[in-house]
Amino acid sequence: MLSRRSFLNSTLGAGLASATSDQAAAQTPAVQPACKRLIVDAQVPVLKAESAVWLWILGLKPRIPEPFTIEMLVPLMDEAGVDRAVIVPPDWSGYRNDYGLEAAKRYPYRFAVMGRIPLKDPRSAALLPKWKEQPGMLGVRVEGWSTDGSADWFWPAAEKAGLPVMFLNPGRASEFARIAERHPQLTLIVDHMGVSVDVVKAGKLLEAIDQTASLAKYPNVSVKLSAAPNYSTEAYPFRDFTPHIRRLFDAYGPQRCYWGTDITNGFAKATYKERITHFTEELTFLSEQDKDWIMGRAILARLGWT
């Protein structure tokens, strides 16, 4: 089985040096043919080595054995043909968004950030009105919030501030439905099809997909068709997951579905390029126009990323 280290070592090569050699070139995307499909990864994490100290302070344990830096990510994107990516800071780094914002500053065309914010901290409410004034910040990503009412302030505040919200909290579709209905101007994006490793292990995959599909009736809700290789029990092209992807595509349509990888998870399951071709070559029910939306146009439009 290919380890994460082997995957990176075999993929980076000379690309690592080229990613840092010319800052001016890094700021400007390469000229591409007019007909090229724009590929946007709706979820990638970045984590630098210094975060190990932060993890220790917070008493957290990282889920990846090594840092995954900007310098590692850029060559992977270049080789696979990924034009842009939405950085979602990993939950094990606490509520730090600084490294993701650093990536957006260094590569403003290629990266933007969905930042993390502590929902139980009463001081967080004051941050939302000016949240998007941080260069490169597009919105907020939340997961695992409490149902004790301590997070209730967040949804109307995010709606008022015009902040898109990505969320992952499987098994709580009824709660999401109430939020979507009460806040129709709030952009809500379900991460990873509403699935998690724990859901799969518990044998509740079909239930989770059904719940996510049920939210499609709310026009302000959309879904990332992301991380399928991580949950599949098969090798590429992960045909056991094709019916689930099809179910959500039929429910939401191409303009509310987004391709993404969460690339640091599941390196052994697929290369970055295979994660692209899984959608562009193996999902035969998708038209070319569908792929244009799902692979990039839709997430840019939904997040207002120009």
Region locations from a protein language model:
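Histidine-centered divalent metal-coordination motifs
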Residues: Q43-A49, H192
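Active-site gating/metal-coordination segments in enzymes
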Residues: D83-R84, S93-G171, R178-A180, S222-A228, ...
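Active-site phosphate/pyrophosphate- and oxyanion-stabilizing loops and adjacent acidic/basic residues
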Residues: V74, L101-E102, P129, A177, ...
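Catalytic pocket-lining loop regions of alpha/beta-barrel enzymes
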Residues: S146-Y258
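Short, electropositive alpha-helical surface patch
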Residues: Y95-R110, P243-D250, R275-E282
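Short, solvent-exposed turn/loop segments enriched in Gly/Ser/Thr/Pro and often Arg
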Residues: V88-G94, A298
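Active-site glycine-centered loops adjacent to acidic/histidine catalytic or metal-binding residues
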Residues: D262
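Mid-to-C-terminal alpha-helical segments outside catalytic/metal-binding sites
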Residues: L2-A19, T28-A42, L55-R84, R247, ...
